[in-house]
């Protein structure tokens, strides 16, 4: 069986175009996680709060970030996909974030195969209100679990690409 974290390349042209393996579809309150060792998706928990995921959420294959997990990615989609869907995505920004004091940044991206997003290249091309909604959700969604998160702000496409290169290098150091 193919392991979506270990066997799939980070993308066709990283860091400019990457693969996003979706774990959680937009609109879901269920937090699914990919079990990297066993190669399947499992329900980690249902969010304790009334929040739902505002975008499709997943990870970039063959990456490892500072929190010890694959690098997270959020993909702006018109319609939600499903756990296990692989999207070819163009990074446009980076949400800097702490989760229980661990660096847990998230790449923001758009699908390369949707003509609605062909001109979206950086954060300036995204409505500020959408960025505020995303940051608000990730600032508050764990509060009722007694956990703390802090969104430190947004950085542009160049920062996202730097994070991707860093995460690919960390993966290679750890897993060869």
Swiss-Prot record:
HAMAP family in the cross-refs: Inorganic_PPase (MF_00209)
Keywords from the named record: Cytoplasm, Hydrolase, Magnesium, Metal-binding
E.C. number: 3.6.1.1
Positions with a binding annotation for substrate: 31, 45, 57, 141
Subunit structure: Homohexamer.
One cellular component term from this protein's GO annotations in UniProt: cytoplasm
Cofactor (UniProt): Mg(2+)
Family: Belongs to the PPase family.
Record's function text: Catalyzes the hydrolysis of inorganic pyrophosphate (PPi) forming two phosphate ions.
CDD domains for this protein: pyrophosphatase (cd00412)
Residues annotated as binding Mg(2+) 2: 72
Encoding gene (name): ppa
Enzyme class: hydrolase
One Pfam family, short name: Pyrophosphatase
Annotated residues for binding of Mg(2+) 1: 67, 72, 104
Catalysed reactions, semicolon-separated: diphosphate + H2O = 2 phosphate + H(+)
GO BP annotations listed: phosphate-containing compound metabolic process
The name this protein goes by in its record: Inorganic pyrophosphatase
Cross-referenced InterPro entries: Pyrophosphatase, Pyrophosphatase_sf
A GO term for molecular function: inorganic diphosphate phosphatase activity
Subcellular localization: Cytoplasm
């Amino acid at each position: 069986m193919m392991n979506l974290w270990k066997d799939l390349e980070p993308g066709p042209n990283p860091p400019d175009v990457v693969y996003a393996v979706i774990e959680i579809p937009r609109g879901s309150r269920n937090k699914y996680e990919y079990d990297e060792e066993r190669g399947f998706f499992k329900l980690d928990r249902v969010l304790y709060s009334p929040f739902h995921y505002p975008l499709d959420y997943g990870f970039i294959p063959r990456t490892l970030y500072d929190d010890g997990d694959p690098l997270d990615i959020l993909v702006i989609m018109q319609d939600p996909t499903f756990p296990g869907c692989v999207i070819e995505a163009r990074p446009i920004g980076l949400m800097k974030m702490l989760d229980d004091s661990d660096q847990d940044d998230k790449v923001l991206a758009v699908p390369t195969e949707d003509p609605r997003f062909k001109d979206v290249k950086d954060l300036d091309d995204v409505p500020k209100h959408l960025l505020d909604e995303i940051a608000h959700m990730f600032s508050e969604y764990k509060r009722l679990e007694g956990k703390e998160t802090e969104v430190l702000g947004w950085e542009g496409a160049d920062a996202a690409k730097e994070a991707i290169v860093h995460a690919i290098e960390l993966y290679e150091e750890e897993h060869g």
